[in-house]
Amino acid sequence: LLPTSHAAVRGRIDHWLEQAGIRPTVAGEFEDSALLKTFGASGMGLFPATEWVRQDLLSRYGVHRLAPCEGVTERFFAIGTERKVRHPLVQRLLRPPLHDSLAPVTVPL
């Protein structure tokens, strides 16, 4: 199970699979990551997910990580109007690197 080719991370996943010598049989491609996870949790196949959702996947779906995709990262951009962000995960995402306050957050898969 993979994100569609429209997803920015898909090219990096395809490159990683090629470098690892893995030629998967793609059972489905998904625009929506929640739908991808739901199909994966139902036993339809393996799927990539960011490290940040690992514990949620285990507790919500009983899904375990098979292996990390070394070198594959996903970038997130957060845009908000609220001056004081209260949600802890959003606070973590918005915490800028010391050298660039406009840099996106990069998360390993």
Predicted regions and their residues:
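A late-sequence structural motif
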Residues: 8-9, 64-106
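Hydrophobic hinge/microswitch elements
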Residues: 6-64
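Short secondary-structure boundary segments
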Residues: 4, 50-53, 69, 82
